């Protein structure tokens, strides 16, 4: 198993896909996706475009759907939800499909939608991602951060480092595919005992703090809360593996 870390979808190699892509958007799309499936959502369907989300979701029964839209960290007017994992409750989500469009995470998912294996990870379900990689042993793996509008993000990189570090701790052998893997592990080693403070310093963490989303940061900075691994079952549609 050879692992590569890419900080944003724009930095991935052109005309290339891995055997397995692990998409990461800790603040907050992949945290929200895992949480929604954990509390009973039937599936999460992701869209880069808000217009595409609305058009597709119109064909779904109203009582069986929820629409979640986020841009710039804030909820989009006219949608049922924004992108907070704390809004994902079993009372709201059970048996429904969540139609989701966010600023960054859904773009990353679009980049690798044709991968043979596509899963999503965050700190809250890091262990589930590691277990999946250990069991399936894909030849090449991309840990793909979503970043922020094409730029680097601390939170996605530290999550990639957390995944690689846990693989090492469990004795699961892998080859380092690029220097970004080493850098991500180093960042995680430095901050693993103080992830919330790291998130407070991250640019997107600061955006969310200005929107009074401290509890979102606290939740997203917690490791191994959820044993669910979202996996793509058809383009853009994720269910619990």
Swiss-Prot record:
Keywords: Hydrolase, Magnesium. InterPro entries: ComB-like, ComB-like_sf. GO terms for molecular function: 2-phosphosulfolactate phosphatase activity; magnesium ion binding; sulfopyruvate decarboxylase activity. It is an enzyme of class 3 (hydrolase). Its cofactor is Mg(2+). Coiled coil: none annotated. Pfam families: 2-ph_phosp. It catalyses: (2R)-O-phospho-3-sulfolactate + H2O = (2R)-3-sulfolactate + phosphate. Belongs to the ComB family. This is Probable 2-phosphosulfolactate phosphatase. It comes from Synechocystis sp. (strain ATCC 27184 / PCC 6803 / Kazusa). The gene is comB.
